[in-house]
């Protein structure tokens, strides 16, 4: 099967553009497209997330590792106690149980491909108490206050 890419809308033929999450997790201006949802011999899900300028993904952690490749634009990624600038083409490995978040805080869309196991644990949203502790790091404080 081939799913043709539409560069204008950053969508793929036959793939629905969905709300990022349905579980009331905190996020802003993020959509999700599931490009591949597993097969018997490839038990992974391949997804595309698009964050509008000023938006951000949920700050979370989980038991599973996942791989992310920046596909569009630039922004920043929080991983544990560090904040990194990311741009198109960058590959990111997010280890299990590492707090992480993506922000489109560079005036552009931030689109990324994400590979995870089909069978995986549920995310653990980083609590406001944990975020308050993390904000003691000036770089993380600036990241969390950025748009």
For each predicted feature, which ranges?
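A short, N-terminal "cap"/entry segment at the start of jelly-roll beta-barrel domains
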Residues: 1-43, 127-147
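Conserved short histidine dyad/triad with adjacent acidic residue
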Residues: 32, 47-62, 96
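A short hydrophobic beta-strand segment most commonly corresponding to one strand
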Residues: 48, 93, 107-125
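A generic "binding-loop/recognition-motif" signal
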Residues: 55, 63-64, 82, 98-99, ...
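Short beta-strand His + acidic residue motifs that chelate non-heme Fe in jelly-roll/DSBH
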Residues: 57-59, 77-78, 94, 100-106
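Glycine- and acidic-residue-biased ligand/ion/polar-headgroup-sensing regions
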Residues: 64-66, 70-75
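Short acidic-glycine-tyrosine-enriched beta hairpin
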Residues: 81-96
């Amino acid at each position: 099967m081939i799913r043709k890419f539409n560069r204008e809308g950053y969508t793929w033929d036959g793939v629905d553009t969905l709300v990022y999450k349905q579980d009331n997790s905190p996020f802003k201006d993020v959509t999700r497209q599931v490009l591949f949802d597993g097969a018997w011999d490839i038990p992974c899900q391949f997804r595309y997330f698009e964050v509008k300028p000023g938006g951000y993904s949920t700050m979370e952690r989980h038991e599973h590792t996942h791989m992310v490749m920046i596909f569009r634009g630039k922004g920043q990624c929080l991983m544990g106690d560090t904040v990194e600038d990311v741009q198109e083409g960058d590959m990111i490995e997010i280890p299990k149980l590492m707090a992480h978040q993506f922000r489109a805080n560079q005036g552009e869309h931030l689109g990324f491909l994400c590979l995870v196991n089909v069978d995986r644990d549920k995310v653990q949203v980083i609590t406001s108490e944990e975020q308050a502790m993390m904000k003691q790091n000036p770089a993380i404080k600036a990241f969390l206050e950025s748009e």
